[in-house]
Curated annotation (Swiss-Prot):
Name of this chain's protein: Ribulose bisphosphate carboxylase large chain
Required co-factors: Mg(2+)
Organism of this sequence: Lactuca sativa
Remaining remarks: The basic functional RuBisCO is composed of a large chain homodimer in a 'head-to-tail' conformation. In form I RuBisCO this homodimer is arranged in a barrel-like tetramer with the small subunits forming a tetrameric 'cap' on each end of the 'barrel'.
Record's subunit section: Heterohexadecamer of 8 large chains and 8 small chains; disulfide-linked. The disulfide link is formed within the large subunit homodimers.
Phylogenetic classification of the source organism: Eukaryota, Viridiplantae, Streptophyta, Embryophyta, Tracheophyta
Length: 477
């Protein structure tokens, strides 16, 4: 027998399988300021106690495996293991629990969202002892936050670059999203920007297809930007989607955008991946480009209430990885978004310090220690009648993005942009005069139609359009 084996045997290594809760369920644990804290919604399999399920999550997302291994004796489990330090039943739900887990900071690579997610939501979501598992929230300690660059520029720097203050920014996604030639696409961009929008946008699946290669699109859109800037005297932008099949190709497109002198590029951060996104964010900061983030694929991850990852976690991860804008739902349009939940993660995107508030789904107090903020983007099924509600819900630090609500105007793209700009300016002026947008919104829009035939035509077209469906993701009662 070797000396190493003798030593291990002498301290009583005992092979076999132990209940996770014997090692990883520690209700007496006092969390540290440096711990990453997680709130999981756990649905155990029948017969599995909630404490065992919570401990299993802590174990499988940190140092544990299914059996005792002799190499446990070569390190300090007490220093490195995750700990389930609290379990509470979910009100109104049968056999669902919130399990609180604390992870020591040394488990994570600095400045890597990829590594953080690989650890916390890696294998554990396929664990057989759990019927379902959802990561509801994370508390990122300030010590870890400071290892991230975060958004390339942030809200204030973006306003300074654009010279636009005191109102939400206006955008438009060019439609049809697929099929236009580069020249016709650029024409649509020009008409929208000339009409009064601040931004236009590539749709998330516009990359470099046979009908419109990326270089051609970039060139025609740059021409549209500069022509509309010269005519209006305002700084304009188009979110040029740099997302590509490889990181190298993505960077090539971002470099070309910078050489053209445009102000902003775009990335699909979930399909593109956090590693690619962080690399692009670093390039954008170093080269003066704003970065718009689309959340394509998010609903695959966050739509189900009992399994997946809540979008507030994906939003926090984006702020760490880097992005100046991110789509965040509308509350009033065609896409998912319950009001209090949406406002909760909008605050997590914009503010420096956010208090724990379970009424808005915020499980932990989060201190971003001056990490730049991200502008939430409201888009999806919105039109001029929604403008008062959007202005009231999202406030000035937001981007309101009307695709069909601009391009669907009966008179064309430029009049559609005029209608949206007039509606926004009317709402901002009314709010600044002390009027209540929530109760007087429709009246404010009707008054503005007297001075804008474009707005009057838009109001007539969309007066009956509503998307009245119950949100899937609601607060626990």
């Amino acid at each position: 027998m070797s000396p190493q084996t003798e030593t291990k045997a002498s301290v009583g290594f005992k092979a076999g399988v132990k209940d996770y809760k014997l090692t990883y369920y520690t209700p007496e644990y006092e969390t540290k300021d440096t711990d990453i804290l997680a709130a999981f919604r756990v649905t155990p399999q029948p017969g599995v106690p909630p404490e065992e399920a919570g401990a299993a999550v802590a174990a499988e997302s940190s140092t544990g495996t299914w059996t005792t291994v002799w190499t446990d004796g070569l390190t300090s489990l007490d220093r490195y293991k995750g700990r389930c330090y609290g379990i509470e039943p979910v009100p109104g739900e049968e056999n669902q629990y919130i399990a609180y887990v604390a992870y020591p900071l040394d488990l994570f690579e600095e400045g890597s969202v990829t590594n953080m997610f690989t650890s916390i939501v890696g294998n554990v979501f396929g664990f057989k002892a759990l019927r379902a598992l959802r990561l509801e929230d994370l508390r990122i300690p300030t010590a870890y936050v400071k290892t991230f660059q975060g958004p390339p520029h942030g809200i204030q720097v973006e306003r300074d670059k654009l010279n636009k203050y005191g109102r939400p920014l206006l955008g438009c996604t060019i439609k049809p999203k697929l099929g236009l030639s580069a020249k016709n696409y650029g024409r649509a961009v020009y008409e929208c920007l000339r009409g009064g929008l601040d931004f236009t946008k590539d749709d998330e699946n516009v990359n470099s297809q046979p009908f419109m290669r990326w270089r051609d699109r970039f060139l025609f859109c740059a021409e549209a930007i500069f022509k509309s800037q010269a005519e209006t005297g305002e700084i304009k932008g188009h979110y040029l989607n740099a997302t590509a099949g490889t990181c190298e190709e993505m960077m090539k497109r971002a470099i070309f955008a910078r050489e053209l002198g445009v102000p902003i590029v775009m990335h699909d951060y979930l399909t593109g991946g956090f590693t690619a996104n962080t690399s692009l964010a670093h390039y954008c900061r170093d080269n003066g480009l704003l970065l718009h983030i689309h959340r394509a694929m998010h609903a695959v991850i966050d739509r189900q209430k009992n399994h997946g990852i809540h979008f507030r976690v994906l939003a926090k991860a984006l702020r760490m990885s880097g992005g100046d804008h991110i789509h965040s739902g509308t509350v009033v349009g065609k896409l998912e978004g319950e009001r209090e939940i949406t406002l909760g993660f909008v605050d997590l995107l914009r503010d420096d310090f956010i208090e724990k508030d379970r009424s808005r789904g915020i499980y932990f107090t989060q201190d971003w220690v001056s990490l730049p903020g991200v502008l939430p983007v409201a888009s999806g099924g919105i039109h001029v009648w929604h403008m008062p509600a959007l202005t009231e819900i999202f406030g000035d630090d937001s981007v309101l993005q009307f695709g069909g609500g601009t391009l669907g105007h009966p008179w064309g793209n430029a009049p559609g942009a005029v209608a949206n700009r007039v509606a926004l300016e009317a709402c901002v002026q009314a709010r600044n005069e002390g009027r209540d947008l929530a109760t007087e919104g429709n009246e404010i829009i009707r008054e503005a139609t007297k001075w804008s035939p474009e707005l009057a035509a838009a109001c007539e077209v969309w007066k009956e359009i509503k998307f009245e469906f119950q949100a899937m993701d609601t607060l626990d009662q």
